[in-house]
Every structure is written in C-alpha cells, then in structure tokens.
Amino acid sequence: MKFAVIVFPGSNCDRDVVTVTRGLLDQPTRLVWHTEDDLDGCDVAVIPGGFSYGDYLRCGAIARFSPVMQAVRRHAERGGLVIGICNGFQVLTEAGLLPGALVRNRDLQFVCDRVALKVERTDLPWVHSYRPGEVITLPIAHGEGCYYAEEATLAELEENRQVVFRYCRPDGTIDAVGNPNGSLHNIAGLCNRHGNVLGMMPHPERASDPILGGSDGRRLFESLVASALAVV
C-alpha cells in the first residue's frame, strides 16, 4: 500500500506518520509538498497534524487553498483513501470533505493528554483490526478540537453511522466526564458517507510503538495494509 503524506508549512507530525508507515510497517511512503498537485499512484493520502500556515485565520483555513488539496479532493472523489489527523481533520472540514467544524476546546485551553476512545465501527478499511465497541487509548494535543455541527448534520451523522470514534471513560461510558474538549456527541473521529475519508483529532501515529506507551494507533495503519492485501 502506497502512502502520500502531505506537508504544509507548519506541519510537524508528518515524520511521525512516515515512521509508522515506512519504518514500522515497511510500506512505500512519500512526502508531498503543499505546492504539488498530483497524487497519482498513491493509495492513502495522509494530512498530518501540526499548525498548517501557523493556524492563521482559523486552523486549516489557509491550507484548504493549497494546490495539493485539489489533488486530495480528486483522490477522494475517485474513492481513494484520505485521513486527516488533528490539524488534518481541521483541514478536511475547512475543505468541505467532511461536515462540521472544529472549534475552541470547551475550557478554552490547549489539551495534551492520553484519552479513551470507543470504536463505533469496524466495517471500514481503517478499523478492521479493532473489535466493535472496543475502548482504545490514543494521545490528543489540540486547542481547537471541539467538534461542532448543527443538529440536522449531527442527526445525519448518527443515522448514516459516520461516527467512527467517540471520546469515553476507560470503562466505555460515553458522557461529559470522558469528553476532553466538549465535542458534540463526544465525536473524536468521523468519516464521509462512503467511508473513504476519515478525520480524527487523536493521534494514532503517536501510539504505534510500545516504547512510547501504547500501540493502539498502529492497528489503524495495520488495518489499511491488511485491507489492501485482502483485495490482492
């Protein structure tokens, strides 16, 4: 499986993703600068975390206009896989590839922590390696990670089963106590209707090696590779 990791000015998690896809999983991976407009040959486009363009105006608001985002859009429209992590999730919402928006955290403070997530779906290429309802632990690091959408959009997300991960307590209880940033419906990650575009605020690439305290995130990347092998 071939990965393309998008790099904007201000991205700072691109190398972390490459360490997982190329270093740990031995998958072909290339870094794609924001001025490029061609993703031909890649299977998965990754928009990593960081502070694209310094988060000026709004997180992801400038990055959405980069030439590479036109290539990402074409890739998604062809059914190609796209994942946005943290700032990448913000970019995807700004670009209209995912509904809703990421706004200031409930307490108006930057949150850096390890949080529990409940896996809501396991029928997508991203999550085959998880069990339905499984509680996993991933790191978060964001100041604007509170997911917001109008009630009609939230209802559609629930009806179409587009919520992939929810913040929860370690025992799986979904409530305000287990919600680190005030996201509506405790949404930590969601997909488009087709399931090929995924956005999530937690960082799976930072939980891909036991030496760093956990490997729950690695299974997301392993799911992708396994899905590709199953097709072959």
Curated annotation (Swiss-Prot):
GO terms for molecular function: ATP binding; glutaminase activity; phosphoribosylformylglycinamidine synthase activity. Its EC number is 6.3.5.3, 3.5.1.2. SUPFAM superfamilies: Class I glutamine amidotransferase-like. Gene3D superfamilies: 3.40.50.880. It comes from the Bacteria. GO terms for biological process: 'de novo' IMP biosynthetic process. Keywords: ATP-binding, Cytoplasm, Glutamine amidotransferase, Hydrolase, Ligase, Nucleotide-binding, Purine biosynthesis. InterPro entries: Class_I_gatase-like (IPR029062), PRibForGlyAmidine_synth_PurQ (IPR010075). Its main location: cytoplasm. One of its GO terms (cellular component) is cytoplasm. Pathway: Purine metabolism; IMP biosynthesis via de novo pathway; 5-amino-1-(5-phospho-D-ribosyl)imidazole from N(2)-formyl-N(1)-(5-phospho-D-ribosyl)glycinamide: step 1/2. Part of the phosphoribosylformylglycinamidine synthase complex involved in the purines biosynthetic pathway. Catalyzes the ATP-dependent conversion of formylglycinamide ribonucleotide (FGAR) and glutamine to yield formylglycinamidine ribonucleotide (FGAM) and glutamate. The FGAM synthase complex is composed of three subunits. PurQ produces an ammonia molecule by converting glutamine to glutamate. PurL transfers the ammonia molecule to FGAR to form FGAM in an ATP-dependent manner. Part of the FGAM synthase complex composed of 1 PurL, 1 PurQ and 2 PurS subunits. This is Phosphoribosylformylglycinamidine synthase subunit PurQ. It comes from Gloeobacter violaceus (strain ATCC 29082 / PCC 7421). The lineage of its organism: Bacteria, Bacillati, Cyanobacteriota, Cyanophyceae, Gloeobacterales.
